[in-house]
């Protein structure tokens, strides 16, 4: 008799074996739905790569809690460029009963549906089939037709087919028809049909167990004038091979070919493939794309497309030989010698005026004196007593010990003052006050005289010459530049007194004021170029006694020195230029009228669709880039020189470079349909096809617009583009003619202010239309003349549903 414990163990083992026998073993195969996202909540979400996400789904594990069982029927995956922020969303079978109403297009996601197939074949890729809804292979390309109970049997038969290579199937969900073919959308894309029959549902599945990278073999050959790339395909291929950034000008479209090639010329030979060839070090790198996803337009790059890099050395680049090395060393020595000579010359110029005496009179009108700025400090063991005797008047001042903090104020904006004095028969005497510094600490009186420490440099010259020498301020050496002017612009302003504030920063030293009188016996014209920086310094001093005997005007010694120069009462002509004139301020013409000023936004850039400004469109939509000057000048004076489109925050590195759509006033064939620039009402426009990048829907258009101020811009002769109006660059008729505008301005001259011109220009001679044309068009064109870089952003979505979602929520 058996032991009861043994019977119990045998019973448990039998039940365990029976339960394992009844559990069906799933051989997981995934069907990919590209660019699809399910818009309902998943049962679990985790940050896993696609391989980890599919592994958890195949094993029936929870991706969040490894080891915990979770039934999985499909996953929605979003790949992240950084390799860490992936998104894996898991769905169970009961959630997939009816997914047709919950599928939305999203380039960021891919949906993978898991099928348990009885096939024993193993696929090396991440998925076995690619799904296309409501499509099927043409009956002429179908080799085998059977009836199956479900989709799983049809997929399994395609994987296990031995008589031919099953590249695709078309499964009829209504009658169970399984149509197998040896062609695919790569070999015969034109054979794929769209199902428009509402009586049955049929879908297309392409077999991806054939590795695409093994199906194509790339080779390239480096030539003197370009790079030749050849491709061999295991199966007949139909598609396109093209340069990454030059689809429209640099491509070949083979039709059911097994061997094909394309020649990519260098930039020095042709510009057709110039954007796809980059220089990296001593090599030229060509980036080639082979379209394998079957998605049109073919220039829309997807991760399924194959990319190939061909590298060739730059012709003419050789290693340095001894002769080249010797010449390079000789050139370096020459450069060093020139630098040393320049430094010696600059040092000599900076020391030129140290030992020269101060010249008080100028006997010749062409004498030019340049003073070198030096700060001189003398330290002795004597008290500081400064005496300047001109008359018998003596003033004694005792300064108490102040205790204040140093305060320094610096004005960075340069001020240039030019003073022109008319000829006077009498000699002119101009007193000038300069400041020097002396430091002392003993008792015997002594007088110390130094050169002026004025931080300004001046040049006095004759009025008969038209050449002005302007000496700029520099801390190490004097630098002179020569300018010639024929017609200087002047403005008459009566300036009886000119006051200039200067200061010298001196640590713990008193100041001494020296009055110097300069007498010019002959009539002269003085032009002074001054660059001033206002600085105020307050220092702490000991009680000192300063004795000064001067004539009026007198200057009291203090830390801050103010110098006042009184000019003769004779009429003067002064031209003052302070910085650059403001662009928004109107200038004054010779006749007193106000000229049109340059506005803050000279060219207005808008994007239109069907005559309405837009900020979001569907990819492939025809839009118009409109450029309108601020003033209503004729469109012949507006020219679009160049345009490019670039993504906003793309995820892939190859998407960062902008694509040109207009170059030198003509289409650049960068991407999509681009028409030549045309004239529009008061401006220009460019009709293009909205382009979208793979990882971002936000793009930016940047264009260079030229306003020709004096004559109509030269016309550009561009080749005709299919899909564009051949009669481009024509001018539209204005709704309001120039005659109507002229009559309105003559009736009410105050309306002229709306054009940025003076109403007095029409009040003087309102009967002449020539005056109107010259004032309105010429002044406004001159005000707007130049090149302007304008930018505009646009959101490009994939479908009308996404566009409605964006309009409703504001999110992409």
Swiss-Prot record:
<feature type="disulfide bond">
    <location>
        <begin position="53"/>
        <end position="88"/>
    </location>
</feature>
<dbReference type="GO" id="GO:0005615">
    <property type="term" value="C:extracellular space"/>
</dbReference>
<feature type="glycosylation site" description="N-linked (GlcNAc...) asparagine">
    <location>
        <position position="172"/>
    </location>
</feature>
<dbReference type="GO" id="GO:0042302">
    <property type="term" value="F:structural constituent of cuticle"/>
</dbReference>
<feature type="glycosylation site" description="N-linked (GlcNAc...) asparagine">
    <location>
        <position position="771"/>
    </location>
</feature>
<dbReference type="GO" id="GO:0009653">
    <property type="term" value="P:anatomical structure morphogenesis"/>
</dbReference>
<keyword id="KW-1003">Cell membrane</keyword>
<dbReference type="GO" id="GO:0035017">
    <property type="term" value="P:cuticle pattern formation"/>
</dbReference>
<feature type="disulfide bond">
    <location>
        <begin position="158"/>
        <end position="166"/>
    </location>
</feature>
<feature type="disulfide bond">
    <location>
        <begin position="26"/>
        <end position="116"/>
    </location>
</feature>
<dbReference type="GO" id="GO:0035150">
    <property type="term" value="P:regulation of tube size"/>
</dbReference>
<keyword id="KW-0325">Glycoprotein</keyword>
<feature type="region of interest" description="Disordered">
    <location>
        <begin position="494"/>
        <end position="584"/>
    </location>
</feature>
<feature type="signal peptide">
    <location>
        <begin position="1"/>
        <end position="21"/>
    </location>
</feature>
<dbReference type="GO" id="GO:0098592">
    <property type="term" value="C:cytoplasmic side of apical plasma membrane"/>
</dbReference>
<feature type="domain" description="Apple 2">
    <location>
        <begin position="123"/>
        <end position="209"/>
    </location>
</feature>
<dbReference type="GO" id="GO:0002064">
    <property type="term" value="P:epithelial cell development"/>
</dbReference>
<dbReference type="Pfam" id="PF00024">
    <property type="entry name" value="PAN_1"/>
</dbReference>
<feature type="disulfide bond">
    <location>
        <begin position="57"/>
        <end position="72"/>
    </location>
</feature>
<keyword id="KW-0217">Developmental protein</keyword>
<dbReference type="GO" id="GO:1903133">
    <property type="term" value="P:negative regulation of tube lumen cavitation"/>
</dbReference>
<feature type="region of interest" description="Disordered">
    <location>
        <begin position="375"/>
        <end position="461"/>
    </location>
</feature>
<feature type="glycosylation site" description="N-linked (GlcNAc...) asparagine">
    <location>
        <position position="211"/>
    </location>
</feature>
<keyword id="KW-0964">Secreted</keyword>
<keyword id="KW-0472">Membrane</keyword>
<dbReference type="GO" id="GO:0040026">
    <property type="term" value="P:positive regulation of vulval development"/>
</dbReference>
<feature type="disulfide bond">
    <location>
        <begin position="123"/>
        <end position="209"/>
    </location>
</feature>
<dbReference type="GO" id="GO:0040018">
    <property type="term" value="P:positive regulation of multicellular organism growth"/>
</dbReference>
<keyword id="KW-0732">Signal</keyword>
<dbReference type="InterPro" id="IPR001507">
    <property type="entry name" value="ZP_dom"/>
</dbReference>
<feature type="compositionally biased region" description="Low complexity">
    <location>
        <begin position="496"/>
        <end position="584"/>
    </location>
</feature>
<feature type="domain" description="Apple 1">
    <location>
        <begin position="26"/>
        <end position="116"/>
    </location>
</feature>
<dbReference type="GO" id="GO:0099512">
    <property type="term" value="C:supramolecular fiber"/>
</dbReference>
<dbReference type="InterPro" id="IPR052774">
    <property type="entry name" value="Celegans_DevNeuronal_Protein"/>
</dbReference>
<dbReference type="GO" id="GO:0048613">
    <property type="term" value="P:embryonic ectodermal digestive tract morphogenesis"/>
</dbReference>
<feature type="compositionally biased region" description="Low complexity">
    <location>
        <begin position="375"/>
        <end position="449"/>
    </location>
</feature>
<comment type="function">
    <text>Required for epithelial tube development and shaping. Involved in the morphogenesis and function of the three unicellular tubes of the excretory system, the canal cell, the duct cell and the pore cell. Also plays a role in cuticle development, alae formation and shaping of the vulval lumen. Required for larval development.</text>
</comment>
<dbReference type="GO" id="GO:1905278">
    <property type="term" value="P:positive regulation of epithelial tube formation"/>
</dbReference>
<feature type="domain" description="ZP">
    <location>
        <begin position="221"/>
        <end position="725"/>
    </location>
</feature>
<feature type="glycosylation site" description="N-linked (GlcNAc...) asparagine">
    <location>
        <position position="272"/>
    </location>
</feature>
<feature type="disulfide bond">
    <location>
        <begin position="154"/>
        <end position="178"/>
    </location>
</feature>
<dbReference type="GO" id="GO:0061063">
    <property type="term" value="P:positive regulation of nematode larval development"/>
</dbReference>
């Amino acid at each position: 008799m058996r032991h009861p414990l043994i019977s119990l163990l045998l019973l448990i083992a039998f039940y365990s074996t029976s339960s394992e026998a009844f559990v069906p073993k799933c051989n997981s195969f995934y069907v990919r739905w590209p660019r699809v996202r399910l818009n309902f909540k998943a049962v679990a979400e985790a940050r896993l790569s696609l391989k980890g996400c599919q592994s958890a789904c195949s094993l029936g594990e929870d991706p969040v809690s490894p080891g915990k069982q979770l039934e999985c029927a499909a996953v929605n995956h979003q790949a992240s460029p950084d390799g860490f922020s992936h998104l894996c969303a898991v769905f169970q079978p009961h959630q997939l009963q009816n997914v047709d109403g919950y599928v939305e297009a999203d380039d960021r996601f891919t949906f993978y549906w898991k099928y348990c197939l009885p096939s024993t074949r193993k696929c090396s890729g991440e998925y076995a089939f690619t799904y296309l809804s409501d499509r099927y292979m043409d009956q002429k390309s179908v080799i085998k037709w059977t009836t199956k109970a479900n989709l799983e049997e049809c997929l399994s038969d395609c994987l296990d087919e031995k008589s031919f290579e099953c590249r695709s199937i078309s499964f009829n969900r209504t009658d169970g028809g399984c149509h197998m073919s040896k062609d695919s959308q790569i070999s015969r894309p034109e054979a794929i049909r769209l199902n428009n029959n509402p009586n049955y549902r049929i879908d297309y599945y392409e077999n991806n167990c054939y590795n695409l990278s093994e199906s194509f073999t790339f080779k390239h050959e480096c030539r003197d004038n370009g790079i030749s790339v050849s491709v061999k395909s295991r199966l007949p291929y139909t598609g396109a091979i093209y340069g990454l950034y030059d689809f429209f000008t640099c491509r070949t479209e083979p039709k059911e070919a097994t061997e094909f090639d394309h020649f990519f010329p260098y930039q020095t030979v042709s510009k057709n493939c110039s954007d796809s060839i980059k220089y990296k070090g001593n090599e030229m790198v060509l980036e080639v794309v082979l379209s394998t996803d079957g998605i049109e337009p073919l220039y829309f790059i997807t991760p399924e497309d194959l990319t190939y890099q061909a590298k060739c050395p730059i012709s003419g680049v050789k290693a340095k030989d001894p002769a080249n090395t010797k010449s390079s060393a000789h050139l370096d020595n020459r450069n060093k010698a020139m630098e040393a000579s320049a430094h010696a010359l600059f040092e000599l110029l900076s020391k030129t005026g140290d030992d020269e005496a101060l010249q008080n009179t100028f006997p010749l009108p062409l004498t030019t004196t340049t003073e070198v700025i030096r700060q001189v400090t003398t330290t002795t063991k004597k008290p500081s007593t400064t005496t300047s005797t001109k008359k018998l008047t003596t003033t004694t001042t005792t300064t108490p010990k102040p205790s204040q903090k140093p305060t320094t104020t610096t004005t960075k904006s340069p001020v240039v003052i030019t003073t022109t004095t008319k000829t006077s028969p009498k000699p002119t005497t101009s007193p000038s006050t300069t400041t020097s510094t002396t430091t002392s600490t003993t008792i015997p009186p002594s007088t110390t005289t130094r050169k002026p420490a004025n931080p300004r440099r001046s040049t006095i010259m004759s009025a008969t010459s038209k050449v002005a020498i302007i000496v700029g301020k520099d801390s190490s050496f004097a630098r002179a530049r020569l300018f010639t002017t024929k017609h200087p612009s002047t403005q008459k302003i009566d300036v009886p007194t000119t006051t200039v504030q200067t200061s010298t920063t001196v640590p713990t030293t008193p100041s001494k004021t020296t009055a110097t009188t300069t007498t010019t016996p002959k009539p002269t014209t003085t032009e002074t170029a001054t660059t001033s920086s206002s600085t105020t310094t307050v220092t702490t001093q000991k009680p000192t006694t300063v004795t000064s005997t001067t004539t009026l005007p007198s200057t009291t010694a203090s830390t801050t020195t103010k110098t006042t120069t009184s000019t003769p009462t004779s009429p003067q002509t002064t031209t003052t230029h302070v910085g650059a004139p403001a662009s928004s301020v109107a200038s004054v013409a010779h006749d007193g009228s106000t000229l049109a000023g340059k506005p803050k936004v000279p060219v207005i850039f808008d994007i239109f669709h069907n005559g309405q400004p837009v900020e979001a469109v569907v990819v492939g939509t025809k839009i118009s880039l409109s450029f309108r000057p601020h003033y209503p000048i004729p469109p012949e004076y507006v020219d679009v020189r160049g345009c490019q489109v670039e993504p906003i925050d793309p995820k892939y590195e190859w998407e960062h470079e902008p694509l040109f759509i207009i170059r030198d006033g003509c289409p650049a064939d960068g991407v999509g349909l681009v028409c030549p620039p045309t004239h529009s009402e008061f401006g220009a426009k460019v009709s293009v096809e909205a382009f979208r990048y793979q990882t971002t829907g936000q793009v930016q258009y940047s264009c260079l617009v030229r306003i020709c101020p004096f004559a109509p811009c030269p016309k550009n002769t561009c080749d005709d583009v299919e899909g564009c109006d051949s009669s481009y660059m024509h001018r539209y008729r204005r709704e309001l003619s120039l005659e109507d505008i002229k009559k309105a301005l003559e009736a009410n001259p105050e309306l002229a202010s709306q054009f940025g011109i003076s109403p007095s220009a029409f009040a003087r001679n309102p009967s002449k239309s020539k005056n109107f044309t010259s004032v309105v068009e010429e002044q406004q064109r001159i005000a707007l003349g130049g090149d302007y870089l304008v930018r505009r952003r646009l959101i490009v979505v994939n479908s009308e549903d996404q566009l409605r979602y964006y309009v409703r929520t504001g999110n992409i």
